[in-house]
Amino acid sequence: MRRSFYASSTENTPMMMTQARVLSTGTTDNGTIRYDEVDETKRWFNRRFCFLTVIGIAVLLLAMVVIVVIVLLLTQLKAANSNAQNAMSSSKVQLEELTRKLSQPLEQLGPTLERLSNMPGFPMGPSPTTQTPPGVPPISPIVTGPNTTPESPRRSPKARYEWKGCQNLGKCELSGYTKPPLVILSLDGFAREYVDRNIVQTLNHIADCGVKADKVYPSYPSKTFPNHYSIVTGLWPESHGITDNSVFDPTISPVLESMKSTKYEKFFEGEPIWSVYKRKTGKKANCLFWVGCAYNNSGYAPDVAPAYNQELPFRNRIDTVVEWLKLPVDERPGLITAYLHEPDNAGHYQVDEEDVDEKLAEIDENLDYLMSRLSEEKLLECINFAILSDHGMQLIDKTYYFQDYLDLKGLITAKGVVGRVYINDTTISVNDVVDKFRCKIDTVKTNTRSDVPTRKHYSRDPRVGEVLLEGRAGVTFYKSKADDYELSGDHGYDYFNPKMHTIFYARGPSFKQNTTISPYQNIQYMNLWMNLLGIEGAVETNGTIGFFDNILTNPPRRDNPTNVIGECPMIAFPSVLKCSGNVSAETLNQLSVKLTNCAFSPTNIPLYSDNHCFQNYCDNSVIVSRKGNDARRAIIEVLSRDEASNPSNFTFLNAKYQSNCPSHIPTGSLTIRQNSQLSSMVDERIDVPNNFLLKVLDPLQAKSMEYLNKFGKMYVISGTATDINHDGIADSNGSVITHIYRIMLICNSTWLLMNPPLCTDSDSMDTLSFIFPITEQSTIDCMSSDDILLDYTATIFDVERISGFQFGIGALSQNQNTIIRRKISTKLW
C-alpha cells in the first residue's frame, strides 16, 4: 500500500526494511535515504502548490467578481422596475389627459385601440378597481376566436355622468356668453320607445336639470329629409318642398331626385333657421351635416358647413361643436345645428333588438362625452342645448312591388313605407292607377291628393305624387324585387304609429328645470328656435307662437285675441220663418217665443274672426260669413244627454237675420241631436253624396251620439268648408262646399260653464276633431267606420285653417288655448 509522502520518517522507519535504502542515484540500499532525493521532491511539491494556489486565488477572485456583478444586476433590475412602474403610471396619466384634451379622440386611433383598452394591464384601459377619467370611451378586448365570455348587461351604463347635477344651473362663469348660443343636436331615428329601454341615461340626467317632451310626433311622412327640414323651417313637407327622401318635380328635373345627392337648390323651399338668424341678426351660424345646409336657397348660407362625411367619428363631431363654442365672441356662432346618423342606421339593418341596444349604449357614451366636455370647458351653463330626433323605427315584414300591379310605362314610382306614384304621361288618369290598388291589397290604403286626410298635410304640393299607398305597420313598397333593399327596419309611417314617435330633451339658462311638455308635432320647433335666438315671429310657420312658453324660464306675456265673433246684423224681431214641412201654428208660436226669450241673453262664442258673425238660436248658434254668397256655415250645439226629445219634420229660419228661405233645402243634417226643433234650422242642412252619407256622415253622427250618452254633456262645432286646391286653407270663394268638420269638447271633471265651454279643471278638458273631404269614391270603401273616423281626425288648428276662424276660450291663458288647439288625437274616445 502506497503511503502518503507527508508521513514522518520517525513513524515510518520501524516499518522499513533494512535493505531498503535510497541511494543518491535514486535507488535504495540497506534502508538508507539519500538527501539529494528529498530536495528534488520538495521542489516538485513547491512548484505544484504554487500552481494550485494561483488557481485557487483566481477562482476566488472570479467568484467575487460574479457576486459583485449579480449584486449590481439586482440593483439595476430593481431600479429599472421602479422606473418602469413610474413610466407606466406617468404614461397612463398622460394618455388619459390626451384622451380628454386632444381634438383627435381615441376613436381616430382605430378599432384596435378601442378594443384593447379593457385588456388587463393595458395602460390605457381601466383596471377593475380604477375609474377612468370622464370622456374616455370604454374599450373592449380583441377577440380572435369564438367569444365565450358572456356580455355584460346591456342596460349597465359604461358612461360616468360626472357632469350631472343641477347645483350650478344657470350660473355661467364665462364672459362673452350673455346671449346663450343655441345648439341643436339630432340623433337620427331615435324612437321614443328607446327611452324606455333605459340605456341612454344621459338623457335622463339632462331632463333632471331641463325639459323633455312626453313624445314628439314627426311630420308626415316620417322620413329623414322631410322631418329634418321641418325641424328647421317650421313647415310641413307639403310646404317646404322636401316631400320625401326622393322627390319628382318635372319643373326642376326630369328624373326622381334623391335629396341626398341632388344638385338642385330649388327643391329646398322655405327659410331655415340659420338663414333667418343670419338675416335678422348678422351673426354667425354653423352647420354640421344638417339637411339643407349645403343649399343656399335663401341667400344666407351657414358660415361653416362641412361636406357630409358619415365616416367622421361621433367624437370628432362633438369636439368640432365644442371648439366652435370656445371661439372668441366675434367668431363664435350663435347657432349650431349638428347631426348624428345613429341609431337610424342600426335600426334599418338590425337582426334583433340587441343590435339597436348596442348602438344606444354607444350613443350614451358619446352624449356623456359631450356633456363632460361642455362641463370641463365651463360651457354647460352658458348655452341652450337641445337634443331631438326626426322619427322612430318599425320592423318590416311584408313587401309589395309596383310592377306586380301596374304597367310602369309612363309612371315614376317612389319606394318606401309610403309608396308614391307620379304620372308622367298625360294619357294615364289618376283613376287608372287607383283602380289597380284601391281595395285590392288587404290592409293597404290608397289615397289621392284629393282625399288624403287633412291632418297629414300631404296634398298641397304635386311633389307628393298623384297616388299614395300606405299599408299597416310593417309593410313597404318597391318598384321591383331587384330594387328591394331588404331592410329589416324602416320608417315613414303615419305618426299614429307609436313606433314613429320620437324625443326632445333640452337644458340651458332659458329652460325650466325638471319640466315635461305634452306631445306635439315637430313643426312647432321653429318658433322655439326663434324665441331662444331673440327673433321671434321673424317668419311665418305652420306652428303656433307661444306653444313652448310653459317650459321657458322667462316667456313673454301673451294675450288672447280680442276679435271675438259678434252677432250678425238684426233685420227684424226674432220669429220663426217656416221654409218646408208640416207644422202646427201652435208649435211655430212656441218656437218663436223661445227665440224671443233668448234673443238678448249674453252669448259668448269661443271663436275669433273679423270675417264671421253668429246668429242666435238659443242653445244653438249659426256662424256665417259676413260676405254675401258664401255657402259655408258652422253650427254650435250645447248638448245634454238629459235634454227632452221633440222630433219635427219641418225646416225654418230665424227672421231676425234672414227674410227669405232658400230655393233648395238640403236633406242631410250637420247637427248631432236631430230630434229637437232647433235641429230643423235650414242652415244646418247639407247635401252630400250617398256613399259619403253612408260611410262618413251617418257613422259620425252615431259616434257623436254615443259620446253624448257616455259623457253626458258636450260642446260641439260642426261646419262646412271650401278647399278646392287641397292646401288645408279656406278658399276666398265659398260657393262650393268641399269638406265638413266637427269639433267636440268634453270635461273629464265637471263643467263650470257650458256656453262658453269651461271645465272646473282646465286640464281636464278634452277635444276630438274631424275634417272629411266630401267625395263619392275614396279609400274609405274598404275601411271600418271607426278606422275612417280615426284616419280623418284633425286638430282644432286644422279646423281653424280650413274654416277661417280661430278657437279660444277667454277664461284660459293663451298658452292653455294653444295646447288645446294643437292637440293631436291618436285614438277615438
Curated annotation (Swiss-Prot):
EC code(s) of this entry: 3.1.-.-
Keyword Amino-acid biosynthesis annotated: no
Class of the enzyme per the UniProt entry, highest EC level: hydrolase
Membrane-topology descriptor: Single-pass type II membrane protein
Glycosylated sites: 296, 424, 514, 542, 582, 649, 733, 748
One Pfam entry name: Phosphodiest
GO molecular function, one term: hydrolase activity
Parts of the chain that traverse the membrane: 54-74
Alphabetized UniProt keyword annotations: Disulfide bond, Glycoprotein, Hydrolase, Membrane, Signal-anchor, Transmembrane, Transmembrane helix
Gene3D superfamilies (UniProt xref): Alkaline Phosphatase, subunit A, Extracellular Endonuclease, subunit A
One GO CC term, this protein: membrane
Active site: 224
Disulphide linkage map: 439-782
Subcellular location: Membrane
Keyword Lyase belongs to the record: no
Cited PANTHER family: ECTONUCLEOTIDE PYROPHOSPHATASE/PHOSPHODIESTERASE, ECTONUCLEOTIDE PYROPHOSPHATASE_PHOSPHODIESTERASE C27A7.1
Function according to Swiss-Prot or TrEMBL: Probable phosphodiesterase.
Family the entry assigns: Belongs to the nucleotide pyrophosphatase/phosphodiesterase family.
Protein's UniProt name: Ectonucleotide pyrophosphatase/phosphodiesterase C27A7.1
